[in-house]
Amino acid sequence: PDLQGFDLDCVELMPLYEAMQEMKMILWLHVGDAREQINASSPERVARIAEGFPALKIVAAHFGGYREWEKAEECLIGRFGNVYYDCSSSLWDMTPERGKYLIEKCGTDRVMFGSDYPAITPAVSLAEFLRLDLTEEVRDAVLYKNFMRIVAGSPE
């Protein structure tokens, strides 16, 4: 949205979100930019979509807002049962402690691993993820179990 020149919550997209909700599709979004002059994919915009379409499953990339993590905590994280997160292209830009905190804050059952390839290679993203002080159970959940449950519909 930031590069394409539209806002995530623009009125023209509402019929699309409605159709996706009816079809039980997943809306996977780039979120965040931290450039106030653009702000097309802010956590606030995702929150408005989540509120307006409570049965639409949303995955908010970059922990709900690339470089807007505080804003994501204020208006998005923990507020909507239909919003999930990925950690793509974020862990390299924060301390391991902050990464662990965000995984826990978002919910260890609601975060999925992601690389944001080609921006960040999978090898770099995985190395950044593995440096976090997480239990094996949480690590496995984020690396694949959450995806299997949230996206693929597997019970585990």
Where do the PLM segments sit?
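The substrate-binding groove and active-site-proximal loops of carbohydrate-active enzymes
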Residues: 1-7
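Catalytic pocket-lining loop regions of alpha/beta-barrel enzymes
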Residues: 7-112
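Short glycine-enriched loops at secondary-structure junctions
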Residues: 65, 118-119
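Mid-to-C-terminal alpha-helical segments outside catalytic/metal-binding sites
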Residues: 105-112, 119-156
